[in-house]
């Protein structure tokens, strides 16, 4: 047999038919073969911890281009100048399930964008639904655990999730989205992304606005029913990733129109809901009909152009955080956002190590000499009125986590608007999906679910009850 040569991680060559150094017969191979130890130790350590949430994902490279002048509302270099282009990388993901789970499962989807700006990296951490389940960050671990497999059997247990929902009514708005066909939008190219949180855009004179940005897919929505999604998951667990990469290979580059909603801090207390409550959406004109419309203003377009060459190095090692902001952007007082400012970097230190920002995927693309572009000195932030200060204090009060009427109003209006917005079949699909889930829980829990749904609408509770009990029987 001809001798072969292999190279260890140190770069040294080893020869021999079995790619091992020549042995002293009196010693074991492990005693002498440092290369074998090297190979095995590298294999044992080659995987890193998966993300606590958003573990399953896919990513691609693209660019953001400014298409509209927004210099009157922001002082963000990346957004100043029509035609300006900024390179970016985007990672799509499922949320609660593990890295090997099917992408078509009923789940909230993530869309995180890292912009490599001249001011440093600016991360947009978005979901495909414009709100979240909870507004009290202390509930987050329990909320995630409730959607994970039962710790006793490691099998999905819907009772855990419905128990959480029935005890935390602020979840109802997003639960309605989750169990509609919005929850089985498995095609990454066709899903939109919403920041969900309010941020602040600050001008050089210290004035500022609350803003919420979102990305509307130019491919249009692509919904599947629960039955179709289940079949897709059985046939191809990586369906969304495959679709994304194959479209890029064909030269079909997906794009998103980026828009921003703007609220003056003096107007925020006058709105009939709190824009710092992430369980509510900023009304674009769909619902509720009696709540102020906050129109979207077009900023630009994001287009994906190519996939990664090394998924682990370029996508898996990406570290996103809502705390990664640039000049002219600040976080709002939203408690969930404030918690995420800590939680994301902390999770990345555990997953990728304390120097995760030095990894190639996360390095800034600033000037080569390390200098920052000159920026005008920003004036101190202008202090809004006492009315605004009193309004902000609501998020720090003990009543912030308690249910209020808007927790039922928003899901109620969503339910009523579905036939108009998406059709009767879309509304009926929500009932079917809920019934299939609720039918798997004990009788006492089912009654609790029906009572909770009745707080939204009697006809919703009645329809879910009827179909659920038919399935059970």
Swiss-Prot record:
Single GO BP term? hydrogen peroxide catabolic process
Q: In the UniProt record, which is one GO cellular component term? A: mitochondrion
> Which PANTHER family does the UniProt record give?
CATALASE (PTHR11465:SF9)
Under Enzyme Commission nomenclature, its number is 1.11.-.-
Q: Keywords in UniProt for this one?
A: Alkaloid metabolism, Heme, Hydrogen peroxide, Iron, Metal-binding, Oxidoreductase, Peroxidase
Sequence segments annotated as region (Disordered)? 1-31, 352-389
Comp. bias intervals (Low complexity): 1-15
InterPro entries with a match to the protein in the record:
Catalase, Catalase_AS, Catalase_clade1/3, Catalase_core, Catalase_haem_BS, Catalase_sf
**Coiled-coil stretches, from where to where?**
none
Q: What is this protein called?
A: Catalase easC
What is the similarity comment for this entry?
Answer: Belongs to the catalase family.
Q: Where is the composition biased (Basic and acidic residues)?
A: 366-377
